[in-house]
Amino acid sequence: MKLKSFGVFGNPIKHSKSPLIHNACFLTFQKELGFLGHYHPILLPLESRIKNEFLHLGLSGANVTLPFKERAFQICDKIKGIALECASVNTLVLENDELVGYNTDALGFYLSLKHQNYQNDQNALILGAGGSAKALACGLQKQGLKVSVLNRSARGLDFFQRLGCDCFMEPPKSAFDLIINATSASLHNELPLNKEVLKGYFKESKLAYDLAYGFLTPFLSLAKELKIPFQDGKDMLIYQASLSFEKFSDSQIPYSKAFEVMRSVF
């Protein structure tokens, strides 16, 4: 049986559960796919050229995580779907010798909220302005939520302004129903915002959501302490991964089937 290689680019990357859940799917569906896929973590130096690495490794597809999603958008031969709007790519697929970029974060995040029966008619504050934040802002706006973005610097905020989001470099004196940590602070065991400011937001919120997964982050720990409903990024990971797997399988395996397999192993 033919072997195809896949992977996930990131820095850091050793924490990623993507290899676990994707390899479970490749093993489960190898008969339907007609090939055996192997998916591995790829630690990418910050200065690396993503497209060169992809081709050099002979990959058929890959996911992209921190901090490369915006750079991945720039190196694709083609961009499809909502990735065109959010200028962020988390899924790369080699199609007819062209590197095609997709974004499954936006829909993956929405499906994870829907899974928790979260209501759409509310407002959200996104902390951070990177590739994940862009995808979430696009996705949430499509679902009718009012989106605000708080970032420590002006870098990247012009995108959100063009999108119609309220943008801040200092914490706004407003209340938000959904507080999303889309920064990398949790990977460094830090809060994304001053603790007292974050407490104030949490006390007025209905859900605290951290894109990090696999451990109780300082962000989620504070929400738990204040008895605020909270959620980590596990469901989003599995939903976006199952949507990516559908792309890797050339739509032979619906994301719903991939989701069930991935959920069973993580």
From Swiss-Prot:
Protein name per Swiss-Prot or TrEMBL:
Shikimate dehydrogenase (NADP(+))
What organism is this sequence from?
Answer: Helicobacter pylori (strain J99 / ATCC 700824) (Campylobacter pylori J99)
Write down any Gene Ontology CC term: cytosol
Key words, A-Z: Amino-acid biosynthesis, Aromatic amino acid biosynthesis, NADP, Oxidoreductase
Q: Which Pfam families match?
A: Shikimate_dh_N
Q: Which family does it belong to?
A: Belongs to the shikimate dehydrogenase family.
Quaternary structure and partners: Homodimer.
Origin: domain of life:
Bacteria
What reaction gets catalysed by this protein? Answer: shikimate + NADP(+) = 3-dehydroshikimate + NADPH + H(+)
The gene coding this protein? aroE
Briefly, what is this protein's role? Involved in the biosynthesis of the chorismate, which leads to the biosynthesis of aromatic amino acids. Catalyzes the reversible NADPH linked reduction of 3-dehydroshikimate (DHSA) to yield shikimate (SA).
